[in-house]
Amino acid sequence: VIQRHLDQAHRTISTWAFKLIVLHHLSVGASLSVIRMQDVEAKIMQDIADGASLSDTIQGYSDELIAWSGLTDITYGEVARRMKLAVETTDYFAPSLSGLIRPDYDLLKFFDHARLVDNGFAAAWSKEDRTEILDAAHTVLVIHANTGVGDHFQRSLTYHRAGYLKLSNWDQAESVIEKARALPHRLVLFAGSAGAKYIGPAIAHGTGKVVIDVGVQMEKWLP
């Protein structure tokens, strides 16, 4: 296990190196997707490994937290399928680094990827870094449960530069993918639950869009 963790550390692209990769893809109009997974995704997969029925809906959280996480009425089997699809199709995968020292948060027990990224990039990039990325993209589409977040981007950057799609539950994912792929925005910032992470690569593939899973760090990106 220690060797596997060392291998993960050696293969993880740093926050600042990944910023250069993102800027390059924006400059040449190439597609890129990155998804982040945190401790909650590790817990869901561990629940399944411990014997949770794939036909049961997600348990072990309050109804309020499940609703906030966009996982209302999803089964363990469906969320596991969607998480696997997300990792298999994304260009870059940013698992929580907690798994390096805590076995119960070790996402790479369940998923692996050739291109790993430091999970903290979305929070670590400074305001100047974020502005540089937004300026390089010129146009940005925000996908988030809170319409106020979308309104803020559109007021700050104007409606010509910023778009918004609402995503508040996993069963909205397919509709969001279809709409996002048809829109012209070059950069897509999204916050999606374990049941909707796969929208990142699905939106990016073949569109020339750079799609970044910023998750709970979305407020840091407010211009």
Q: Where are the model-predicted features located?
A:
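Short Gly/Thr/Asp-enriched flexible loops that form oxyanion-binding sites at enzyme active sites
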Residues: 198-208
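Glycine-rich anion-binding loop/nest that anchors nucleotide
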Residues: 187-195, 213
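Redox- and metal-dependent alpha/beta enzyme cores, enriched for Fe-S-associated oxidoreductases
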Residues: 133-179
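Glycine-rich phosphate-binding loop signature in dinucleotide/nucleotide-binding domains
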Residues: 181-184
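Electropositive, gly/pro-rich neighborhoods at or near active sites that engage anionic ligands
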Residues: 1-145, 149-153
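Short glycine-rich, flexible loops that bind phosphorylated cofactors or substrates
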Residues: 102, 196-198
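Short, solvent-exposed amphipathic alpha-helical segments in soluble enzyme
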Residues: 51-52, 154-160, 204-206
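Short, flexible loop segments at boundaries between secondary-structure elements
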Residues: 208-223
